[in-house]
């Protein structure tokens, strides 16, 4: 922690000219704040976002874990970058008690490894109750491998998700899009916990009461199924598989 008589020259906050030392809360917070708003728009390693408002694309330069606190947003306009949060073949874990809302224009991606293929690509993991919302663009989430351990995901884009492999062990997923709920680029691997209920609809923005109970196979029906909802639910007599 920096004080008037002892300023850490390596502290990215307090070493600045005329810095407010009373705001110093230690190197850990200073480094997190620096990483959250890096001048070149890059992040790597362990990063904490707390009530961040980001308006330029962010790109990973190494495997990264983002811990969310409070309400965080990334909103980008039509830029040269493809994704609001670009994984660039890296692995990304998003965790924490906070939320992240990503809003992008047409043809752009939300949280994505935009150039993944059948041979290379990173893994996107959501856990610890993180709340993820995506709005607009081509894909909400796009990665070769997506793992949802827990959390609440509300994805509304051209496709809510684009992936070759989706694993879901807990949490709540609502994915919808005008093209489809889930796109199966380079594969249709699914591993969805048997304790979770899968609902589907051939309509975009469908309400759960209007959806039918399905199976993992329905999450691969790329062009037909426009909305997918997966969560732990109590059985309802009105829901019939394949109805």
Predicted regions: what they are:
Residues 13, 25-243:
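A composition-driven surface/loop motif
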Residues 1-31:
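Thrombospondin type-1
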